[in-house]
């Protein structure tokens, strides 16, 4: 799906989320990262979620007073940008539940990225935001059969958009 859910779809998804949380689900996860794609190179549906849609799902957890949210939030590893802070704050305020976000890794090219992100996120961390990281170095194996890592770059958009059999080889 390459659009945000409409009001009816959002209500149905919220009802399913409520049912799942009541049955023991931990909460929900989402992503805004360009490289998180689904079938045929299309964006995962949650990538297109509107603020109203996210608010509705967060309210499900608030109303039940349980659950947590995990969100893949940083388009640049280790760098929390202003619009991402707004999403994080919205989820915290509307859910009143813990929200964990990825990804904080030390970077050779932006040595202060994690420190700056933690400073920027401090008010939200005080409200229950929890950044995620890894004790291991970030490494990637890349080949053209699974070019996942390139999806974050606008210059690769046409490659992922080409659905022809020739392009998919």
Question: Where is each model-derived feature located?
Answer:
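Polyanionic/metal-chelating signatures
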Residues: 1-8, 16, 21, 43-44, ...
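Catalytic pocket of metal/acid-base enzymes, prominently hydrolases
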Residues: 1-71, 75
């Amino acid at each position: 799906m390459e659009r945000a859910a409409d009001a009816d779809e959002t209500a149905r998804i919220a009802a399913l989320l409520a049912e799942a949380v009541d049955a023991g689900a931990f909460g929900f996860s989402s992503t805004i990262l360009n490289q998180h794609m689904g079938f045929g190179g299309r964006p995962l549906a949650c990538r297109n979620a509107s603020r109203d849609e996210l608010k509705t799902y967060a309210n499900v957890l608030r109303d039940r007073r349980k659950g947590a949210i995990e969100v893949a939030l940083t388009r640049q590893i280790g760098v929390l940008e202003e619009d991402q802070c707004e999403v994080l704050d919205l989820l915290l305020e509307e859910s009143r539940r813990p929200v964990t976000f990825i990804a904080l890794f030390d970077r050779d090219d932006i040595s202060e990225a994690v420190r700056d992100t933690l400073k920027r996120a401090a008010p939200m961390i005080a409200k229950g935001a929890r950044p995620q990281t890894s004790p291991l170095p970030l490494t990637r194996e890349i080949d053209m059969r699974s070019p996942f890592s390139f999806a974050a770059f606008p210059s690769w958009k046409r490659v992922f958009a080409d659905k022809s059999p020739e392009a998919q080889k």
